Amino acid sequence: MKLTCVLIIAVLFLTASQLITADYSRDKQEYGAERLRDAMGKFKGSRSCGHSGAGCYTRPCCPGLHCSGGHAGGLCV
């Protein structure tokens, strides 16, 4: 009986803390889409030019590098 009461109180406490936290953070992400877009720009796959050793089939090599092996499967060197 005591264990059941302790479990019920623990569940009520955790539920209340989740509801309080959810209500507090509701308006905190006003510019979430902008932050996501800025973070996506930092990924390796979204760079505008191919760095040394990168493939040059889908994007051009960065300045100072050239495509070795042709555009059908070459690498930026």
Curated annotation (Swiss-Prot):
InterPro entries, sorted: Conotoxin
Propeptide stretches in the record: 23-47
Free-text tissue specificity from the UniProt record: Expressed by the venom duct.
Recorded GO MF terms: ion channel inhibitor activity; toxin activity
Keyword RNA-binding tagged: no
Cystine pairs: 49-62, 56-67, 61-76
Entry keywords, A to Z: Disulfide bond, Knottin, Neurotoxin, Secreted, Signal, Toxin
Main location: secreted
UniProt GO cellular component terms: extracellular region
Subcellular location: Secreted
Signal peptide: 1-22
Domain-related comment: The presence of a 'disulfide through disulfide knot' structurally defines this protein as a knottin. The cysteine framework is VI/VII (C-C-CC-C-C).
Family in the record: Belongs to the conotoxin O1 superfamily.
Name this protein carries in UniProt: Conotoxin LiC42
UniProt lineage: Eukaryota, Metazoa, Spiralia, Lophotrochozoa, Mollusca
